[in-house]
Every structure is written in C-alpha cells, then in structure tokens.
Amino acid sequence: MRGWFSSNFKLCLSCIQILIDVARNMSELAAFNERISDLFRLRALQSHLSWDQQTKMPPEGASARGEMMAWLARKHHQSLTDEDLGRIISSLEKQDLSPDDRANVRLMRREYDKASLIPEELVNRMTKASSDAFMAWQEAKSNSDMNSFLPHLRTLVDLTKEKISYLGVESTPYDVLLDDYEVGMGVKDYDPFFSNIRQRLVPLFQAIQSSSTKIPEWPDSVIIPESEQESFCQNVINEIGFDLQAGRVDRAPHPFCSGLWPGDTRLTTRFDETQPFSSIYAAMHEAGHGLYEQGLNQNFAFSPRGQAVSLGVHESQSRFWENMVGRSQSFWDVAQSWYDECFHSKPNYDKSSLYNLVNQVKPSYIRVEADEISYNFHIMLRYEIEKKIFNDNLPVEKIEETWNDLFEDYFGIEVDCASNGCLQDVHWAYAAFGYFPTYTLGNVYAAQLYEAMQEDLGDLNQIISNGDWTPMKTWLNEKIHIHGSLMEPTELIEQATGKKPNSEPFLKYLESKFSQIYQL
C-alpha cells in the first residue's frame, strides 16, 4: 500500500509540475503579446504623426513635431530593447508554439537583436534629423535648391553610417541598409538581379527609341482641373476595392500610403493640371498599397505577424494595380467612360489611343512618371548612388553631380534642375537608404503573381474588361494579404505562385507588350 501511495504521489507531483510549467508558459506568452501590442500601438502613433506632418501640419509646427517624433522614438526603442523582453523571447523560443506565435517570436528576435545594438541617443538624433530634413526637403525641392538640403542630407548620411557601425558589417555597409527593407537581400543578390534586367531591357528600350511607330502624346496646352482628376481617381479607387469606410485619400508633395491598422489606412496623391495621368496612376499605386494594409488579418494587427511581410511584396501590390491592371488595354474598356465623363476639355482619344498614350516609352526625369521599362533604370541609378555613398564613401557634395552623370548615361539626356534630379524623391529626407531596390523587386513579384492569378482565375483581361475586379482583389487577399509576415517574403511568393521568385515573367511581359505596341 505504501508503494502504491508513493508512486501515485510522484505521479501527482509530475502532473502538478506540468500544470505549473504550462501556466508559466501561458503567462510568458501573455506578457509577450502585451508587450508587442504596446510596441505596435506606439508605431501607429508614429505613423499617424508622420502622415499628419506630410498632409495637414502647418509649417510652424515643424520644430515641435520633430521633438514629439524623437520622444516617441525613444519610448519605442526603450520598450523594444528592454532586457525583460529579451528574456521572454529566449524562453518562448524553447517552447512549442502555434505557427502564429512562433512567427511573432521569430520576428521580434530579429528586431530585438538589431535594436539592442543601437544606442538610444542615436535613435533620438536620427528621428529629429529626419523630421527636420523632411521640411527642408519640401522647400529645397520647391526651389530646386540642392545646396539648402545638403546640410540635412550630410547629417542623415553621417548618422546612417554611425548606425551601420553599431550593427556590424558582414559583407558591405550597404547590405546592412538593404536588409532593413528586404530581409536577406544584399549587394550580392541585387547586383546580378539588376544586371540581368539591364541586359534584357536596354536593347528593348533602344529598339523602341528607334521605332517609327507614332504614339499619341498629351498636348501641353490641355489643362485638366484638379477636381476633374479627383473624380477620375475616385472612380478607379472604388473599382479597385479600396474601402473608404476604413481609409481616406489626401494630398501630399510625394504620394504615399500610411497603414495605421487595417481599419485606418490612408492614401495620398498629388495633382498636376497639365499631366492628369500622373495623378491617376499615383492613386492606383497607392490604392494597391492600401488594399494590402486593409487586407491584413485584424486579429494580429498589433503584432509583427500581422504586418506586411516586406517592402518588395508591398511594392508588388501597388505595381500590380498601377501597371498590370492600370496600363493594360482592358483597363480602358472600363476607364474610357471615366475619361469621357470626368474630363471636360480633353482630346477625343479612343481606347486604343489612350492605351498607347499611357504606355509611351521615352526618357523622363521623374521616376514615378516613368514608363514600365525605363522605371527600372531609375531604380538602378539610385541603387548605384547609394552603393557609392555607403560602400565607396562618395561625398555628399558629389551626389548631385554623380546623379546627373549617371542619368545621362542611362537616359541620354541632361538633368535640367535639381527638383527633376536628386531632389525628386522624399526617401533620402527620411534616411530611407536601401529602400529603392524594392521597387523593381516589386515589379518582378507583381508579374509572377499576375501569371499565377491568370492560371487560377482564367483570362484576366476579360475580368478587367468586365469591370468587376473583385476576383483579383480576393485572390490577392487570400494568397498575400491575410498571411502578413507568417512566412519570409520568398516563401510567400513561392507559396502563392508555385515557383521561386524569378525575373523571367516580368521580362517576358515587357518584351511581349511593348513589341506589340511599337511593332518591333
């Protein structure tokens, strides 16, 4: 009897210990989830203040706004690098977690390790410098005055180099920045990636420039008021499926999308009364970003698992709607009526003329207004300059000259002013060095997704022509959006398409489309 009691007593103790361990693990997971929720609420506040700075804030608010942003950045950094969070992450890594929880732990480990290497005071200085630089960039761009922006750019480059020094360099300094925007991607990946695209697109671009095919051009004398452009943009945003009950559209010097959470996603665009298609395609681009943000799983909104997986994938969503849909021939089966109804004093172009007009290939100064082929040359130019800045120590004072020289090499024309050159993008004013390559990566992903979508849904041209684009939006919701950051970017693309990411669908798409337009 004593032996029976002893063995059962030990069994009870084991069961109690198991229950204690389960309770401890549950407690740690609950504490972890509470901490990361607070982190992502802080990020939402930062995002909202940044959106306000670019859309609504009066100029005199700049100084105080910079202080607010720096304070929030400090609080965020303190929370992210808290040693208790690191201890909890280490404990959870040893536990048997659900796929969602495991993704959160994996992603937070990456963030915690990186942030812990960077001093809080550097985060503070970078945030304040970026806020000040944005305001200086707006004025410098407006006046086409690179000299007035140089001190701010120099500060941001110096601070970024300081950040790199803390993070450590395994291959090249620029790799540290590239990895911030597309995890795992570095110079060793992008160099052959861009080389392959350049080898295929340069001959195509040159053949088009030599083509005798005449493409309609928008007359310089035709003015389309902002209100009429806004009506067109509203139609296309509605058609894409962007939910205005969970978002809004405003104006900004440089179009962007700000996702506070799936129920509050904010787009911006800009208008030029002499270039109405610029605003249309900016709206489609940002609405593509917006659909991704609205399509994320709300159950994970305040966690890393619930965020967009990468900038490359994010850009695939914007470029899909802007180019694969918006610059297709079928698009004008729907948009012709918007053109006729919204634009009052306009050339009487038919659908075929409008399709050719918006797909005209020619050298252009502005990246966001470039055609689908030369757009990638704009990205390569920026990639080469950033590589020179951080790997070859190109002086900030030489950036404009280097830009202009490379631009002439790529496009065969001289840059006429700084606002059409190195001042045109907002990215460097936010120290977003390493971001640009994700745009071409997004083009590549978009073409691969389009190809897979067509296999699943049938003729996409017919779907676009019909004017009900819900099947395309739903496919992207199910294949991309809802997964958030559950997987790594390349895993997500492979799962969605059945193939590893590769450039071939994108290159074939461009070669086929523009050979037909220009009768090559």
How should each PLM-predicted stretch be described?
Residues 12-15:
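Cysteine-centered motifs
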Residues 23-183, 511-518:
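A well-structured
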Residues 25-28, 44, 60, 64, ...:
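C-terminal, non-catalytic "cap/extension" segments appended to globular domains
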Residues 32, 168, 285, 318, ...:
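Divalent metal-coordination and catalytic microenvironments
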Residues 129-278:
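Contiguous, non-catalytic segments that form substrate-binding/exosite surfaces or channel walls
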Residues 281-294, 315-319:
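Active-site recognition of the HExxH zinc-binding catalytic motif
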Residues 307-345:
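Post-HExxH zinc-binding segment in Zn-dependent metallohydrolases
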